């Protein structure tokens, strides 16, 4: 009886481990897709010659304006 129970337990644990790997693979796929999208976006911005530095400065100013000073 104990051996059969051990086998059942082993089978259950292996079945539980399989989907985790699938999830990791899916995550990797989406990550690589996102990277490609980023590269495409970067190429577009280079073609349009968007001033990225100015945009960053604007972001910082907006962030500072929103955060309450003197905590």
Swiss-Prot record:
**One GO cellular component term noted in the UniProt record for this chain:** nuclear speck
Instruction: Name the domain of life.
Output: Eukaryota
Keywords for this protein? Nucleus
Pfam families xrefs: SNURF (PF07192)
User: What's the protein called, per UniProt?
Assistant: SNRPN upstream reading frame protein
- What family classification does the UniProt entry report for this protein? Belongs to the SNURF family.
Additional note from the record = Encoded on a bicistronic transcript that code for two proteins, SNRPN and SNURF.
* InterPro entries for this protein: SNURF
Intracellular or extracellular location(s): Nucleus
Q: Which organism is it from?
A: Bos taurus
What gene, per UniProt, encodes this protein?
SNURF
